[in-house]
């Protein structure tokens, strides 16, 4: 009887292990590779763009980004530098803005982040698995019809198909992430599905970067991409890359639901 009980216990333990592994895999499906075709995309009209911005700025009410802080932080690096020892990923921060002269508040531009897999195995980013030597961008937005909140890979889509209209004069630096730091990024992404005119893409990128990097950045008050860009150049200008390649390795997703975009397919 004891042997039978031990055998049953062993089978139950194995079943739970298998089930747990399967469940973990199910929680992180593989991201779908982006098409690399040469199609011609027509952007929205200036009027529709203005309407989107007005709707986003007046109806989106997301609060602050309350991010977990890593228990250890990495140093800032030049874009393209070799990953630090023990790193599984690189976190890159990007910022750009239009020149608005003496405007008291310049809300133009955009800021976002990317994670590049520098390991020899798949890693999880935002609930999706990405392969070695591939990358995923992400940032919240309030001015796209399908969703207000976190978007993945939209920057790469725009840069591939509408390169002349998006992300000119952009600057970036990077930092290395070990598995523990990447886990912090992912837990913070799970809390990032919102946006408002005040707690915007610049607030998000500042907070996410500072949670894992010892060399902090500021997007100012109010948070703006221009302030973030200026801080990158003031503090780490000798490390910043100008107009780097923006990856488009995977299709566009939005939300914590990881819904594939229909508009940007």
Located regions from the model:
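Second-shell loop/turn segments in exported
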Residues: 98-103, 167-175, 187-196
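Glycine-rich catalytic cores of cysteine/serine-nucleophile enzymes that process amide/ester linkages
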Residues: 62-168
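Activation targets extended, charge/polar-rich intrinsically disordered C-terminal tails
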Residues: 28, 37-58, 63-67, 184-265
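Solvent-exposed, acidic/flexible segments
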Residues: 105-108, 175-182, 194-202
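Bacterial N-terminal signal peptides
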Residues: 11-19
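Sec-dependent signal peptide cleavage junction
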Residues: 18-36
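Bacterial N-terminal signal peptides that target proteins for export
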Residues: 1-11
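Extracytoplasmic/cell-surface-exposed regions of Actinobacterial cell-envelope-associated
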Residues: 116, 177-179, 217
């Amino acid at each position: 009887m004891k042997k039978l009980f031990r055998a049953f216990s062993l089978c139950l333990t194995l079943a739970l292990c298998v089930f747990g592994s399967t469940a973990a895999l199910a929680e992180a499906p593989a991201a779908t590779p982006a098409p690399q075709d040469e199609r011609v995309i027509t952007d929205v009209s200036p009027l529709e763009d203005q309407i989107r911005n007005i709707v986003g700025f007046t109806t989106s009410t997301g609060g602050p980004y309350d991010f977990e802080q890593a228990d250890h932080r990495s140093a800032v690096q030049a874009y393209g530098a070799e990953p630090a020892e023990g790193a599984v990923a690189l976190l890159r921060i990007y910022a750009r803005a239009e020149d608005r002269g003496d405007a008291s508040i310049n809300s133009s531009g955009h800021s976002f982040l990317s994670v590049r897999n520098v390991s020899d195995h798949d890693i999880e980013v935002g609930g999706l698995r990405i392969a070695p030597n591939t990358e995923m961008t992400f940032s919240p937005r309030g001015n796209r019809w399908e969703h207000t909140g976190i978007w993945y890979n939209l920057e790469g889509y725009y840069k591939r198909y509408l390169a002349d209209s998006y992300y000119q004069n952009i600057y970036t630096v990077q930092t290395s992430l070990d598995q523990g730091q990447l886990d912090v990024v992912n837990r913070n992404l799970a809390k990032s599905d919102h946006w408002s005119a005040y707690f915007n893409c610049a607030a998000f990128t500042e907070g996410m970067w500072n949670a894992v990097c010892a060399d902090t950045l500021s997007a100012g008050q109010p948070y703006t991409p221009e302030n973030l860009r200026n801080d990158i150049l003031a503090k780490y200008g000798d490390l910043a890359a100008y107009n780097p390649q923006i990856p488009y390795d995977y299709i566009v997703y939005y939300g914590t639901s990881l819904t594939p975009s229909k508009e940007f397919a």
